[in-house]
Design a protein with these regions (language model features):
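Acidic, contiguous internal or C-terminal segments within carbohydrate-active enzymes
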Residues: 1, 60-111, 252
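A contiguous, surface-exposed recognition patch within enzymatic or periplasmic domains that forms
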Residues: 3-8, 14, 93-101, 105-247, ...
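Extended, loop-rich substrate-binding clefts of extracytoplasmic carbohydrate-active enzymes
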Residues: 26-82, 209-240
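TPR alpha-solenoid repeat register
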Residues: 410, 443-444, 450, 484, ...
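Canonical tetratricopeptide repeat
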Residues: 413, 453, 487, 521, ...
């Protein structure tokens, strides 16, 4: 067809669509660990892999900042195959359970003749969060505030006037796509439906609003829709758990196709439809590569209605008609075979039946209105799993604990909630309460998770002996063995007992062969034991699993020898200028969490030297912490001083280890105002507001000339303490210190609006005029306010 089967946007016009802002239309968007991908506009690590069969894979990888999970996608083209194969992997690098979603969204060109191609068993679609539902393809009610009661085919783009999402209910088919009737071509996605649960279409709509967004996002390439394919999820939001150090992987395929139109079934090899034209049946077949002597067979009850042989290629789809001879069309079975008798694709019509339309989701009840402790726990867990923005899961856990203080699940959940927010000591009694209930009648519980979590709360407090005991008890449960043995090996390394560490890391890997962090730690242990050849063999094997295992690549360098510099050069080439500083910190922490502080320092200094010493402040705080844990207090203080001198712009610590770093910096350098400021940022982001405000107040005591901490303190005073006058005073001082800072301008404007201080605001507005002009929302609000009170502007 000589066409772009994925929407090709010839210009880059970023719009404020993505979770963190900039976003462009076109191509295939990969949304993870949530929608839209927070790092959409950030660089990614990449490499190219070539194979003997002529296929080429481009790998992209990142360790994302929000939840510290790792995602990889390998894009492969094969000679003679008309599809793009995507091999994807997601890996939880953390010691705690995490959640993720993965939606791969190709954009496709749309016109009035475009329609979506959902599987034939899809009879209903959901809105986001399943808050609304519609029959499909014929909508018969109100959906997105549009009245479709007359019966409207919403699979057709021309029938959807407003921005609309719809996601299919469960399907037993492996495909979803879209088709342009005017050019007889479309795009199809194929993946195993057991994993690929999500099948969705999104459009800006064909009305005025949609056309406005066409202009926002492109100059000349026109409207598009997104065909969204969800792996391990069927809705947005819909999140799946990744247990500590767990990896999930899958394959998915995107392909152009022609002639078939409304697909009835598809595989990565072939796409087919079977339809009725008056008294005849028709088969249309498309294949993604060249096949000789393909057999098309249509039968019913042992009787053959079509049996034909064709040479196939993507350039030449086949259409075959056959007489029905009175047979019930929906009882026909279609099979397509290659010349070896292997089934390429098959289809048997769905039974005619009226399927029920599912109910939309219901909002969570207030905790006091939920009768059972189990439902309180499950509601709280759902809110955590789905990252709900307004409901607080702890309200449900604590309501349950008020009724039954020893409940295992809610105590464990509360402990995890606090652990995720850096409250290691506060989490400990909840885990202990869960364990007390578990062992009341049996010292050997079936569930080892509370022991494992207790181990981590103790380890993060530096209570290694107690943590060791808790982790060992957790290994009595098979579900915790891989993560608990890994934690034991870390403590063994901290104790310099590398023989015992090797025993434990091997047990961990037996339970989780793809634990990339355990592989790095085993390489480190083997090096420490002088078993360099075994370490090199392990590293080679590990890199065949994950080329972006930076810890293993660094270990290859640490092994020394003639190839050491080459190993370092290859690692640095992979971690080129696109690699985030946060990834360097992550990989350094992999070493530090096992007491390998010298190795952690060497790795992080690569970033420092690469940037001539001018780096993100947390780099030096990490280096200071590594020195402090190595009992080199003078070096630690020197690093902490350097950290305090780095530019504080956009420094938002969010790693649990960074709490320990900043607390240690405050211990050794109590007058470091920036360390208090950064720690306050962590606490506020973790919704530990009292701790945040206390840290910011201490920062201001030490340095009241830093406008951002004053601005942050104002937010805390106003939103969490109802200290409105103090909040306004902080903002006014922040603005006086630096009136060019846009957010202080906007925040002060907003706060004054709450006080009704309009003319004071107008007077201050001139000074910050060009700032608010740059911040469009602030500029519009300023003008709106002046107009409302009779003040003109120019």
């Amino acid at each position: 067809k000589q066409r772009h089967f994925v929407y090709y946007n010839q210009v880059i016009k970023p719009a404020l669509v993505g979770l963190t802002g900039p976003w462009i239309s076109g191509g295939i968007e990969f949304n993870w660990p949530q929608h839209h991908r927070p790092s959409t506009y950030l660089p990614t690590e990449c490499t190219i892999e070539e194979f003997p069969d002529g296929s080429v894979t481009v790998w992209c990888s990142e360790v994302e900042r929000m939840f510290r999970t790792k995602g990889m996608a390998g894009f492969t083209l094969y000679p003679g195959k008309a599809y793009l194969e995507i091999k994807a992997k997601v890996y939880n690098r953390t010691s705690l359970p995490q959640t993720f979603l993965w939606w791969a969204n190709p954009a496709v060109v749309v016109h009035k003749d475009y329609y979506s191609v959902f599987p034939p068993d899809v009879n209903a679609v959901f809105d986001h969060g399943k808050r609304a539902v519609s029959s499909f393809p014929i909508a018969t009610g109100v959906y997105y505030k549009q009245d479709y009661s007359s019966g409207v085919d919403i699979s057709k783009y021309k029938n959807i006037p407003v921005p609309t999402s719809y996601m299919a209910i469960n399907s037993k088919y492996d495909f979803v796509g879209g088709y342009e009737e005017n050019v007889e071509a479309g795009l199809l996605h194929v993946a195993d439906h057991h994993v690929n649960a999500g099948k969705k279409q999104w459009t800006w709509g064909c009305g005025d609003f949609g056309q406005a967004w066409d202009r926002n996002l492109t100059d000349e390439d026109g409207p598009y829709i997104e065909l969204m394919t969800g792996m391990y999820c069927d809705n947005q939001p819909d999140f799946t758990w990744l247990q500590p150090y767990e990896e999930k992987e899958w394959k998915q395929y995107f392909m152009p196709y022609s002639a078939v139109g409304m697909v009835k079934n598809a595989t990565k090899e072939a796409i087919v439809t079977l339809k009725k034209n008056e008294y005849k049946g028709e088969v249309i077949l498309y294949t993604t590569s060249v096949y000789k002597s393909v057999r098309i067979l249509v039968t019913c009850g042992g009787k053959v209605y079509l049996d034909s042989i064709h040479d196939m290629s993507p350039a030449e789809p086949v259409k075959e008609s056959f007489a029905l001879n009175g047979v019930e069309f929906d009882s026909l079975k279609l099979c397509v075979y290659d010349n070896n008798g292997k089934v390429l694709v098959e289809y048997e019509a769905e039974k005619k039946e009226i399927k029920p339309i599912p109910d939309p989701a219901k909002a969570a009840k207030d905790p006091k209105d939920i009768a059972s402790i189990e439902q309180l726990y499950l509601t709280g867990l759902h809110l955590e799993q789905y990252r709900h923005a307004t409901y607080n899961p702890t309200d449900y856990y604590m309501e349950a604990l008020s009724r039954e203080p020893g409940d295992v699940r809610c105590n464990n959940a509360m402990g995890l909630f606090l652990m995720r927010r850096g409250q290691f000591a506060k989490a400990q009694p909840y885990f202990e309460a869960a364990i007390a209930t578990l062992i009341e009648r049996n010292p050997n519980p079936i569930d080892g998770e509370p022991h494992y979590n207790l181990g981590w709360s103790l380890k993060m407090q530096g209570k290694f002996d107690e943590a060791y005991d808790a982790f060992f008890k957790a290994t009595w449960s098979a579900a915790q063995q891989d993560s608990a043995y890994y934690a034991l090996a870390q403590i063994d390394c901290i104790r310099n007992d590398f023989e015992k560490a090797l025993e434990h890391i091997d047990r961990s890997l037996v339970r989780n062969w793809h634990n990339h962090k355990a592989r790095q730690l085993k390489a480190s242990i083997l090096r420490k034991l002088g078993k360099k050849e075994a370490a090199a063999t392990l590293i080679a094997e590990s890199l065949s699993i994950d080329k972006f295992n930076i810890g293993c690549r660094f270990e290859l360098y640490l092994l020394g020898g003639e190839s050491a510099q080459q190993a370092l050069d290859e690692m640095m080439a992979l971690m080129n200028e696109t690699t985030s500083v946060h990834s360097y910190i992550e990989y350094a922490l992999d070493f530090a969490n096992a007491g390998l502080y010298a190795e952690a320092e060497r790795l992080l200094l690569l970033w420092v030297n690469k940037n001539d010493g001018i780096v993100y402040p947390m780099v030096y705080y990490a280096l200071g912490y590594f020195a402090s844990k190595s009992d080199d207090v003078l070096k630690a203080i020197d690093y902490y001083k350097k950290a305090s001198q780095m530019a504080p712009d956009y420094c938002f610590p969010n790693k649990l280890e960074e709490v320990l770093m900043l607390q240690d910096a405050n211990r050794l350098q109590p007058n470091d105002s920036k360390a208090w400021y950064y720690l306050g940022n962590f606490w506020y982001g973790a919704r530990q507001h009292d701790e945040a405000i206390a840290c910011w107040e201490r920062s201001v005591e030490l340095d009241d000339q830093f406008p951002t901490v004053l601005r942050n303190l104002a937010l805390g005073y106003y939103n969490k303490r109802n200290r409105k006058e103090d909040a306004l005073a902080c903002l006014e001082k922040a603005f006086a210190l630096d009136y060019e800072r846009r957010f202080e301008v906007f925040d002060q404007w907003s706060l004054r609006q709450h006080f009704g201080v309009v003319y004071q605001r107008a007077a201050f507005g001139g000074k910050g005029y060009y700032v608010s002009e740059r911040l469009h929302s602030g500029f519009g609000k300023r003008n709106e306010s002046f107009d409302q009170y009779g003040r003109g502007y120019s």
